[in-house]
Amino acid sequence: MFIAHLPAGYILAKLLLKKFKQTKITNKAFFTLIMLGAVFPDIDLFYFYLFDHRSVHHHKYFLHWFSFWLPIFLIALCYFIHSKYTAKPALMISLFSGAALLHIGLDTFVGDVWLFAPFIDQPYVFFEVSSRYQPWWLNFILHWSFFVELLICLIALILLVGKKN
């Protein structure tokens, strides 16, 4: 995914908002947590460009591992449920890490993701984007999958505009 992580986070927040309306988290904090979580795994791009000099695919870094986010999500969610839905920090961690899992799932659509790292060193991807154009990002923008990203953005925009009316 190239441009749809933040809009996908917004869609996720809209879908979950009614379910968690009774919690003591403000709507602003609720949306902020999920939308930050939806883009957070890509902070490894700073390391990728500034220190690693693009020598290792940034999806190999631990912030793009299911094995990193899934235990955080499950432990926080179990604690939230065990607290009879009152542990606000557990809910916040669940929302953030759940959105990070969404990010990784979206990346798997057309980008290599090492789903089982660090245990298995193999990338997985649903659809390959072949390298035909320079610069490299044109390969993604001119691929049919970019339409899916635009669709996600459009759905998020419709939900946002619909909220204001």
Spans of model-derived segments:
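N-terminal membrane-targeting hydrophobic helices
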Residues: 1-165
